[in-house]
Amino acid sequence: MTGKITTLLFDLDGTLINTNELIIKTFQATLQEFLPDRVFTREDILPFIGPSLMETFREINPAHAEEMRVFYREYNLKHHDDLILEYEGVYEAIRVLYEEDYKLGIVSTKMYDTIMRGLKVTGLDKFFQVVIGLDQVSNAKPDPEGIEMALSLLNATKEEAIMIGDNYHDIEAGKNAETLTAGVAWAIKGPEHLAQFQPDFMLEKMSDLLAIVRDEE
């Protein structure tokens, strides 16, 4: 793939905003509520980060998956603003990309309203022209539907786009949509885990994107 990158699509959790503690505590509360006889460590919960909630809960407890999803969302929203954190340098890098007229979008496995809440808490909401949540697509990442929808709304092509994320779902979705891909080294599962899915780039910090998009011009 050659040519100018004009469009950058991002995952939200673990990429733009640090919701790791929020997610882990929410999973712990949900699992304690529905599976009190089982013990889940933080390490046990890490694989749950990335897939959609229903995908995870159907594997754990298919008979109560929907109830678990509802409980999770209620707990998550209640504690959201207290546990969400910013990643150093993300706001500034996104601001520069926005000011340089790059097209910016989000493709997440979270619901649209929860995405917007996280963006507003961190002040990032003003930079993104398109936000695609789980409730706007029929197929979650790694299916390319969300990326393709975002590109269409941004009037952009796959040849000029890059998908950035912290999980294999993000990298695989980008590959399935035939965009460039970038992993983030601050992923909770670690850069080594993400590297095995062979993203085109690995970001040590969000500002690394500036060099990548400028080099592609």
Swiss-Prot record:
GO CC terms of this entry: cytosol
Q: Which cofactors are named for this entry?
A: Mg(2+)
One Pfam family this chain carries? HAD_2
Name a biological process GO annotation. DNA repair
The catalysed reaction is: diphosphate + H2O = 2 phosphate + H(+)
Q: Which UniProt keywords apply?
A: Hydrolase, Magnesium
Q: Which domain of life is it from?
A: Bacteria
**What enzyme category does the UniProt record give?**
hydrolase
Catalytic-site annotation from UniProt: 11 (nucleophile)
Q: Which Gene3D superfamilies match?
A: HAD superfamily/HAD-like (3.40.50.1000), Putative phosphatase, domain 2 (1.10.150.240)
Q: Which GO terms label this protein's molecular function in UniProt?
A: inorganic diphosphate phosphatase activity; magnesium ion binding; phosphoglycolate phosphatase activity
InterPro entries (alphabetical): HAD-like_hydrolase_sf, HAD-like_sf, HAD-SF_hydro_IA, HAD_2, HAD_sf, PGP-like_dom2, Pyrophosphatase_Ppax
CDD domains hit by this protein: HAD_PPase (cd02616)
E.C. no:
3.6.1.1
Sum up the protein's function in the record's words.
Hydrolyzes pyrophosphate formed during P-Ser-HPr dephosphorylation by HPrK/P. Might play a role in controlling the intracellular pyrophosphate pool.
Family stated for the protein in its record: Belongs to the HAD-like hydrolase superfamily. PpaX family.
Q: What is this protein called?
A: Pyrophosphatase PpaX
Naturally occurring in which organism (per UniProt): Listeria welshimeri serovar 6b (strain ATCC 35897 / DSM 20650 / CCUG 15529 / CIP 8149 / NCTC 11857 / SLCC 5334 / V8)
State the encoding gene. ppaX
